[in-house]
Amino acid sequence: LVALALNTKIVKISKININIAYSSKNKEYRESLLKRSIKQSIRSYYETLFCLSRSQKILNKSIFKVENRFLYSQTNRDFGLILLSAHNRSVDLLLNQLTIQEDVTAIFKPIKIKALNEYVRKNRQKSGSSVFETNFTGVKELFSALKRGEAVAMAADQVPAKNMGVYENFFGRKVYTTNLIPSLHSKTKATIVSVAIHSDSHTNQLYIRYGSKSAYKEKSQYNAKTMNKEIENIININPEDYNWEYKRFKKQEVEDRSIYK
């Protein structure tokens, strides 16, 4: 599978992204990271299929441990909770594990194949989450959930639709970035806690790690720049866990149409 993957478009995009994100690293480091990343991407695809096809009882055994749970459990919930994540391993498995603790409202980009989209949506909701497409209705549902003091989750590392973002720094490039989470935070006073699935580099066991916490009362304003920095922090814990095959740098403040050609 790895040999096959090394000849695909996925590898080309991943290589470009890794070279941008870790331009200060030497060639040997970047090439090694690329190979390890492809292996972990294949594994994360399996994790998604596993998540969508197995019973909740089996899925509950898939995570080895949870780090910094106190960031989640000791949060004032009067204004709701925003769980910030990125496409680090399987977002489906992460959402599933988050909803074991409580109901979570999340948004996602629909899959073009209608039947597959409905299948995925149905299975994403089996553990108690409410999922909506990334559109006006979906955003409205996020606001409503926060107003009720509930939790919402979003992977905020993809290029947003036109007029739905701002240009902000991400691994040294000014890229088009969603401003939805900063907007939700500003309008609802909800606390933001970052969370992602990682793999242990020694044992390959999966674990969930809660990262930083940002509250509305803090002096520094939470914005897209702060959000992107936290996503970088998530990725840098174990860069091979990140799904580098997405064209994250395709829309930059300084246009570069040839970047993925």
Predicted regions and their residues:
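Hydrophobic alpha-helical segments typical of transmembrane helices
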Residues: 14-17, 94, 119-120, 138, ...
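Short hydrophobic/aromatic-rich motifs at helix boundaries and adjacent loops
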Residues: 41-43, 65-66, 90-94, 112-114, ...
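Catalytic core of membrane glycerolipid acyltransferases/transacylases, capturing the structured
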Residues: 79-136, 162-169
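A conditional alpha-helix N-cap/helix-loop micro-motif detector
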Residues: 63-65, 113, 132-135, 174-175, ...
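Non-catalytic C-terminal accessory region of glycerolipid acyltransferases
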Residues: 31, 35, 73-77, 100-101, ...
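Short, surface-exposed alpha-helical recognition segments that flank or form part
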Residues: 6, 130, 218-222
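Membrane-anchoring hydrophobic helices of lipid-metabolizing enzymes
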Residues: 1-85, 118-122, 126-128
